[in-house]
Structure formats: C-alpha cells, structure tokens
Amino acid sequence: MSQLLHLHRLSLPQSSLRFRFPPLHRRRAASSPTNSTQPPLQFRPLTVSRSQITCRFSQSDITPQFELDKAKDNRKPQKRANGIFWIILINLGIYLADHFFQVRGIKSLYLYHNFPAWYQFVTATFCHANWNHLSSNLFFLYIFGKLVEEEEGNFGLWLSYLFTGVGANLVSWLVLPRNAVSVGASGAVFGLFAISVLVKMSWDWRKILEVLILGQFVIERVMEAAQASAGLSGTIYGGYSLQTVNHIAHLSGALVGVVLVWLLSKFPSASMDQDVKKSS
C-alpha cells in the first residue's frame, strides 16, 4: 500500500497541481515604465474645444429646410383690408342719420357752392342723395378701395380717398353754378379706380383688356346711379338745387388720382430704401 502511494506521488508531481503567478510587486514593476521620474497619471475630465467639433451634413438633408425657410422669408405678408370697411361704415352712418333719423344739422355736411365751409369739401364725399346713389358707390368703393389698400396700406387708402374726393369737389365748386349742391363719393370712386389701375398695371395685353372692359363697366354703372338720383334734382334747400349728374366730379376725381400717383412716384418708398441698405 505504501508503495502504491509512493508511485502515485511520483506520477503526479507538485508542479502540475499548482498554477504559479508572478508576485504582485513584480507585475507592477514590469508594467510600470523604467523612467521613475515621469509623473503619475492624472485623470482629467473630457474637454473638447469648439474649434475641433465639426458637423457634416449631406446636401440632401439641409437643402430642403433651407429652401422652405427662404420661401417663408420671401413670402409677401398679407395686409388686412380694414380701412375700406371704416369708410363704408361712415358713409352708411351718415346716410342713416340723414334719411332715416333725420338728424338736425346733418345737411350742413353738403357742399353748398354759394358759400361753402372748408369742411364741406371733405364731408360731402360721405353724403349721398338716395339709396341707389349710395349702394352703387359703395359697391365700386369696396372693389377699388380694397385694391388700393392691399398695395398702399390703410394710410394710403385714406389719403387717396380724401385727396381725390376733395379734389373732385373743389373742381366742381369752381365749374358748377353757385346755386348747386354737391354730394356723393363718385369723385373718390373714380379716383380710386384710376389709382388701382396705375398701381397694379403691367404692360400686358390681358391687363389692358381687363382695364378697358372694367373701366367701361364702372363708368356706365356710376352714370346709371347718378341718373337714378334724379328724384332729388329739383329739390331746393334754401335756394340751392342738388345736381343730378356731376360729370365734372367724376372726371376730376380720376384726374386727381392720376396726379396723386405721379406725385407719390417722385418719393422713394421705404421698402426701396431697406432693399438698398440690405444690398450694401
């Protein structure tokens, strides 16, 4: 039995039963650098300068968004037409106060050619003889007034309406007899028509054809409305006769509108100045 144990010990040497590792201090010495003067390792937070950061995008990823932003910037902001509705409401209010409620002193807003007050040249553009006269003027006032306001803004609309209306009344006062009375926005309507045509006009045969057809329609309708107000042609207010058709006001209103556009074209617009500054 002792011989068997002795043989077993000989067949299984001690070196085969153990896993030998180098000592810990030797492993550290082997892994550490030979230069003992090198400072120990220090852990620093990860920092990257901005100049080292580069982002790469493909053109297909960035171009569509750029084009969308550019289209939004170039899109013309839409202007809400509010001034024309205020002008229409003022005309309606004065008509109701004159013909329905018969407010005392409302007829002092008419333009009496014999001895006119300075404000009557303005207020007469908001007065009308009857409903046919008012409804026809308001129809074309809305169409052409909205066109002018979309291009020139609220202030431009009021300036055009008052300038052409006052100009038409002034020419009528100079030409018509002294016992005449002038009311109506027909002069301002023709003035707004001329301004809208000149502002939006482009030298295209389609646009010219539209202007000719629409201009003839406007003239006919306004003349019919003026003829429809013939019921007041013989009405006398303290020795004054209300004129039926004021052709002078119609033509002078359109002429004043042309003059207004010509005068405004002499002044550079704010948008042109901004474009020049941006380009420089």
Curated annotation (Swiss-Prot):
GO molecular function, one term: protein domain specific binding
Database matches in InterPro entries: Peptidase_S54_rhomboid_dom, Rhomboid-like_sf
Gene giving rise to this polypeptide: RBL11
Protein name (record): Rhomboid-like protein 11, chloroplastic
Active-site feature positions: 186, 250
Keywords (A to Z) from UniProt: Chloroplast, Hydrolase, Membrane, Plastid, Plastid inner membrane, Protease, Transit peptide, Transmembrane, Transmembrane helix
Family designation: Belongs to the peptidase S54 family.
Membrane topology, as annotated: Multi-pass membrane protein
Taxonomic lineage from the root: Eukaryota, Viridiplantae, Streptophyta, Embryophyta, Tracheophyta
One of the record's GO cellular component terms: chloroplast inner membrane
Segments passing through the bilayer: 83-103, 118-140, 155-175, 179-199, 244-264
Taxonomic source organism: Arabidopsis thaliana
